[in-house]
Structures are given as structure tokens and as C-alpha cells.
Amino acid sequence: MSNEFEDDYGYDWQPPSDDEGRGFDDGFPFEGNEGADRWADEEDEPAKPAEKYDHHELLEQRVTVHCPVAERCGGCEWLAMPYDMQLERKQDYIEELFADYPVEVEPLMCMIDPRGYRNKVQLPLAPGKDKNGNPTVRWGIFEKGSHWIVPCKQCMVEDPAARPIIGTVARLMPDYGVTPYSEKTCTGTVRYALVRIAHATDEIMLTLVCNATTLPKAFVDAILSAHPEITTVVLNTNTERTSVILGKEEKVLFGPGYIEDELCGCRFRISSSSFYQTNPIAAEALYELAVEMADLRSSDRIGDAYCGTGTIGIVAAKASGAELIGIERNAEAVKDAEINAQINGIENATFVAADAGSEFARMARRGEELDVVFMDPPRAGSSQAFLANLSRLGPRRVVYISCDPKTQIRDIKHLVHNGYRIKRICPVDMFPHTDHVENVVLLERAPRNQFGHRRNSRKDERGGKR
């Protein structure tokens, strides 16, 4: 596991100061700030991590935020909160959420240095004017709650190599007659610049999202001359009047059209549209934790539900030699998963483009078996049909990875009712300085008695602390 990640509250970090030593509030919901109670939406469920705490205490411990756009951005809601306090709030949230179950929540896994972790940066470009009224290219972030672009040359949670590339794109555009896109008039060329950086290999992909199918070659050459570290450039065409960033058509302008990164000893191909964890340091720790929880055998048959490009399943299959069946609704992601399996020499892997619940139902009807299931559903959680069919298949272990623990606990109640027991709970801080927390739960199938019923499956689970 990377030494940049640790599983306790220790850290050695203070917010960096900029050249002018400026500090800004970040809009965190302290006393008097609008939105202080915005998480109190369900009376009978635990509040999100910051809601219940004394605002005077938070004000006393608040740190100076050295981000010139923190108030206008809103992306890092907790930037003014000391990192160890952020971790404490997230730990408390998970512990309260799972308080009805007799399983101690393990210490939250966290970053030693919670800066520069985002490997994907996508920023809009638009027409602007300088102080003399001359046309310029405006680039930066959308102001919170609007589509007004706020100039921002660096961001403390992004890889520092990304924004200078986007700045160069904006600077060179007028020299080559390349115009920024106007949302008001739907004219102009460049809508977004997207940079993806491979943490382990340092490969860099620049994707230019354009209201056009071509760009001047001299313009692309100038970008590459200024940034020889770029390994591939892709033109993504999006001519629709939409807030969706990427279009469906792409053309490779330089390099292979993708980059490759490494996680847990496996290599993964990343395109402009591929889903790939934006915090690779935390992702590696999370995957190693998930595989450890699964306790796989070489004879096992693994199900990887909502598998995306196959990352978790491939890491597990390579570590154990077990057979892998990955299920993902997005057909393009399935193609990426198949390529990733080939890259890593995983020969006993099959990927299916289907709804996970429907595929599990088909497998159950055919009498197929799964020994271990990894599930990493979207924020909305799993469907009742998926959970019912998962219970029918009856794997001995289920490793449930969630980006929304509130929907995770809802789904887990269904699995517990159908004969599973929670064995381990471990939160992971994938997104420092935000209220988001990832959570990994291991469930095991309760043993059957001689009459075929599961013993104490519900009573045991409901006997926990309150």
C-alpha cells in the first residue's frame, strides 16, 4: 500500500500560502453562514458529518484558507476545517450510521498529504475582454451555482501539472485563430480543455472539447512544443446545445489516444471518457482493502457488479488467480474492461454488457454460482431486484463499496434480512476537504442449520449498540 496513505488520524499538513499570503473563507457552514443546516433532510437518519457540531467550536479551530477563489468555487466545502477534524467528523458519521450493528467501525483510511490528489481536470473556456476591452480567452472554474467563469490558475486539490497546460491552450488560441465557445451565441470552437494525468506513469492526455471537427495542426504543435510532457492529444466534438461536456465523436491528433496508469500492480488504459478513480492514491488503498476483505481462493468465481472498466475485479483476479465475471451496463466501458484484462494477462475473465440485476437473475435461473461478489454501485445504490438476485446466488462473501453510505446502509438492511452478516466496516477518505466519504463493508453469508434456514440472521444483526 502506498506510503502516501494511512489508516489513522495522523497528518502533517497545513494549507499552503500563496505569493501574496492571501486567505479566504470557503463558505463552510459555520455559524451565520447560509446553508448551515442544509443536511438535515431526514429526521430518522444520521446527519451528514458537520451538521451536529458546535459552530463556536468550529470557528475556534478554523484555519486560514489560502485559496483565492474558495468562496466563489464551493468545490472544497471543508477547506477551512483542519484535516484531522474532517476525518473525525466522517468517522463519527459512519459510526452513527451503522450503530445498530454489533461491528466496530475501523479507523478511517486517510491521506497523509491531502493536496494535489485529483488526476482529472476539466475547465471551460469562453470569450472575455481585457481591461482595455480587447477580446481574450477566459478560462477557469464555474462560479458556484452559475456558468460565470472565475479565473483560477491553480487548485490545491488537483495535480499541479494540469492547469498550466490549460493556461497554455488559452494563451495560444488567439495566435492561431482558434476561438472560445460562447454559450450565449453557440458560436466559437473550444468549449472545454480536459487534462488527465496517470499518477504512476506520468503520462498526460489533453482532450479539447470543440464545437468543430478539426483544429489547426500548427496550434496543436505549439501546445506540444510548450508541453512536451503531453503524451496524447484528442479532439472531442460536441456541437449540441447542452451542458454535457463530452460529445460522442473523437479524433486522435497526437499519440495513441489514451494513457495508461498502474494500480495495485495492474495496468489500466484510460481514454477521455473512461471512468477512472480521480484519487489514485486513495483508490489503490481502497482496492487493496477490498481484496483483503474478500479473502479469495484461486478456485473462486468472482462477480464484479457495476464493474466499469474492470479495475477492482482485475486487481482481485490477478492477486488470486480466481475466475472473474464483470457486469456493466455501459457497453463502451465493457470494451475498456476487456482491453484491461488483456493488458494484465487475465485470461479467465468475462465481461457482460448488461444490467447487473438482470444478469444476476439470469445466472440464478441457470443455476450458476458466485463465491465472492464485489459491488460498487452509483450514488443511488442498488435496486431491489439486484439485491434479491444477489441473495439468490448466495455468495459466501460480499464486498460492498459505496460513495454514499446512506444508500449503502439501506441496501445492507436488505442483505441482512436475507441471511448476511456484517463482518467489517472501513471508511476511506477519497475526497479530502469535502463532506464525501467512501465506505467499504464486508458481509458474509450466515451458516445454514440442518433444515436449510439461516441461523439468527436478523436477530444477531439487530442486537448492536444504539
Regions found by a protein language model. Name each.
Residues 119, 202-204, 299-300:
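Nucleotide donor/acceptor-binding cores
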Residues 148-191, 212-234, 241:
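Internal alpha/beta scaffold segment
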Residues 5-9, 20, 24-27, 31-34, ...:
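Rossmann-like S-adenosyl-L-methionine
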Residues 195, 202-211, 267-271:
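Short, aliphatic-rich beta-strand segments
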Residues 57-65, 71-180, 200:
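Extended interfacial segments that mediate partner engagement and assembly in macromolecular machines
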Residues 140-143, 207-209, 337:
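Short, acidic/hydrophobic/Gly-rich beta-strand patch recurrent on exposed beta strands
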Residues 107-114, 183-184, 191-192, 196, ...:
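Short, solvent-exposed loop/turn elements at beta->coil junctions and helix N-caps
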Residues 124-126, 196, 209-211, 444-446:
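Solvent-exposed residues in well-ordered beta-strands and their adjoining turns
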